[in-house]
UniProtKB/Swiss-Prot annotation:
GO terms for molecular function: nucleic acid binding. It comes from Bos taurus. It is found in: Secreted. Belongs to the pancreatic ribonuclease family. The gene is RNASE10. CDD domains: RNase_A (cd00163). This is Inactive ribonuclease-like protein 10. GO terms for cellular component: extracellular region. One of its GO terms (biological process) is heterotypic cell-cell adhesion.
């Protein structure tokens, strides 16, 4: 059977039409797959953004918890509270101690290192097992504290004794018992971080905070 040119041309046309239809269907399927991929990508990005937002909220909540923990330990910054002279010893002579640290330790500004419950735990308590009501820690170089004793003597609340005033405000941690009548080992202190002038009795190392 011989094919004429017209028949061959008609068969070629049918073949091309078949290829065109197949290619069109293939393109439609590819477009559908791409559209579905875009939707999945959008959903993933949206979920990732939501997870980051939730993580940020959790981080803020954790930071707030840390702040509350510091507050529960009763660490009080001087700029956050108004402290009267009575609260920081008034005209009383209080026992004091110069904390000897290396230069690196002295320059550290971590408030928790100056929390009174930790500092006072190392102190010798009263013989009758009552907690020491008030105590002062001086965060200055020992030479600076010794130099106070070379200044002119001034009047202070110490019978028969002499006191000397610091030439500048000293960095102090004042520890005050939160409630009177507490006994060992249940001593709970409030922490005051101050910069104040001091009157010091060099004979027995007692300090009075002054302005």
């Amino acid at each position: 059977m011989k094919l004429t040119l017209v028949q061959i041309f008609f068969m070629m046309l049918l073949l091309l039409l078949g290829l065109g239809v197949g290619l069109g269907v293939g393109l439609q399927m590819a477009a559908a797959v791409l559209e579905e991929s875009d939707q999945l990508l959008d959903e993933f990005l949206s979920s990732d953004s939501q997870d980051k937002a939730e993580a940020t909220k959790e981080g803020l909540a954790s930071r707030s918890t840390e702040t509350l923990l510091v507050s529960n330990k009763e660490v009080v910054q001087p700029e956050d509270t108004i402290i009267s002279e009575d609260e920081v010893g008034g005209d009383r002579m209080l026992r004091a101690e110069v904390l000897l640290h290396s230069n690196k330790d002295y320059l550290r500004s971590d408030v928790m290192d100056r929390e009174c419950n930790a500092l006072m735990a190392l102190k010798v308590k009263s013989k009758d097992h009552t907690c020491i009501p008030q105590y002062i820690f001086i965060h200055e170089e020992l030479d600076a504290v010794k130099a106070v004793c070379k200044s002119p003597a001034v009047a202070c609340d110490l019978k028969g004794g002499k006191c000397h005033k610091s030439p500048r405000p000293f960095d102090l941690t004042f520890c005050k018992l939160s409630k009177s009548g507490q006994v060992i080992p249940h001593c709970n202190y409030v922490t005051f971080i101050l910069e104040k002038y001091i009157l010091m009795s060099c004979s027995d190392m007692k300090v009075q905070i002054t302005s």
